[in-house]
From Swiss-Prot:
InterPro entries: RNaseH-like_sf (IPR012337), RNaseH_sf (IPR036397), X-over_junc_endoDNase_Mg_BS (IPR020563), X-over_junc_endoDNase_RuvC (IPR002176). Its cofactor is Mg(2+). This is Crossover junction endodeoxyribonuclease RuvC. Mg(2+) 2 binds at E66. It holds the Pfam family RuvC.
Length: 176
């Protein structure tokens, strides 16, 4: 089973794909999408197109997106919310179930502490995905979101069920 994690951002959107087989996690790919254009509509379209390419290219089975927090800059929060809408829309349009997690939940799941620093998150992502080369901080966060969702799916027994379905002899694709 492949899980796509997305760390939404208007200028930089982080993404990461991991493969989950039982309790084993393996890095597939990660990157950062930089929006193009100066107008909001152009940036959102750029995010949409590039994220659609990521989903098509890596064929995830599930997706997870980080919740955004509200800050004092209402305009900035609204713009980030619009980028988050793209992050939710693209995998949903591809037929994926999309989960959402609060930043503190992701950190607690990956690091063990809900208020972990970015450096701690990056360190734990590297430990859980040996050999990974991070494309940047946003990509590391996206991989952490994917790991968090994988842990959630494992606790619900969904990984085993999906792995059986995908590896079934009736012609469905095999999971790597």
């Amino acid at each position: 089973m492949r899980v796509l994690g997305i760390d939404p951002g208007l200028r930089n959107l982080g993404w990461g794909v991991i493969s989950v087989q039982g309790s084993r996690l393996r890095h597939v790919a990660n990157g950062q999408i930089r929006s193009e254009g100066s107008e909001l509509a152009q940036r959102l379209l750029s995010l949409y197109r590039q994220l659609t390419e990521v989903v098509a290219g890596h064929a995830p089975d599930a997706a997870a997106v980080e919740h955004t927090f509200v800050n004092k800059d209402a305009t900035g929060t609204l713009k980030l919310g619009q980028a988050r809408g793209i992050a939710l829309l693209v995998p949903a349009a591809a037929g994926l179930e999309v989960a959402e997690y609060a930043p503190n939940h992701v950190k607690k799941s990956v690091v063990g502490v809900g208020h972990a620093a970015k450096e701690q998150v990056q360190h734990m992502v590297k430990l859980q995905l040996p050999g990974v080369v991070l494309a940047g901080a946003d990509a590391a966060d996206a991989l952490a979101i994917a790991i968090c969702h994988a842990h959630h799916l494992q606790s619900r027994g969904k990984v085993v069920a999906v792995n059986r379905t995908v590896a079934a002899p009736d012609g469905l694709r095999s999971v790597s």
